[in-house]
């Protein structure tokens, strides 16, 4: 959808685009697989919207009640709002592209979807990276003076870093409009599943694309990986120290540390899979209708939903609020039957 390559700007561009979208020769998926893929994607979108909507509602209620919100809660609000917008956008794009192809193929509509998609994805990547970094600074057990100073100042820095991430993501999304379009020239070939047609990037576009992806995807990816690995190592070292001093009975603190290690490991795996899928999808490495491209879409849709569910499961406040919500939902049918 958002990773297509188009020919240069001409009067026939919209017609050529629709031909490329509708050409059955490029489709590698059967009607059954297409229907199954759409069903899976819609289920992932709805799950992500519900989970992130719950996180947003809980912290918004905390903000209204206490006139303030914790630093981690602020990051979660930014992250969940960006994911709600992203999941809604992707679901809307599937609906429009499936029901009104002529409208979707218009330049203004297509580029609005593309820019919004990249902006929200980059925001999500940055916010998740800052969440990992914040947990690392607050939980990791290091005694370096610079680290201790950072721990003391991190709560005041996070709001500025979040808005800086929004600005960076917006700048990249506006910049991408000139570099994420393929050109049929004779400079740099990109793999296409159709052997009768070759798609090319101009040399300038290739350099710009590499710079663009490095800043938008690789930097938050590296930051997330480093923060998560250092946090896991710190928790592992502390767990081993606690184990050596254990008396034999189960220590709740040790179990909490082990749970934190597992949760951080899951977050790290999900984040890496999502970043790689996004990079492949935006790079046009595969045809838009190929199985690999579809797999990337499924991964990108699954990440916000699965990560948010894990956040609810591993956060005591969110987990308690979710159980209370489930309890109230179970009570409503009983009240109606009385």
Swiss-Prot record:
Cellular component aspect of the GO annotation: membrane; plasma membrane
Keyword Membrane: yes
Cross-referenced InterPro entries: TAS2R
GO molecular function: bitter taste receptor activity; G protein-coupled receptor activity
Swiss-Prot/TrEMBL keywords: G-protein coupled receptor, Glycoprotein, Membrane, Receptor, Sensory transduction, Taste, Transducer, Transmembrane, Transmembrane helix
Function per UniProt: Receptor that may play a role in the perception of bitterness and is gustducin-linked. May play a role in sensing the chemical composition of the gastrointestinal content. The activity of this receptor may stimulate alpha gustducin, mediate PLC-beta-2 activation and lead to the gating of TRPM5.
Protein name: Taste receptor type 2 member 39
Organism, scientific name: Macaca mulatta (Rhesus macaque)
Lineage of source species: Eukaryota, Metazoa, Chordata, Craniata, Vertebrata
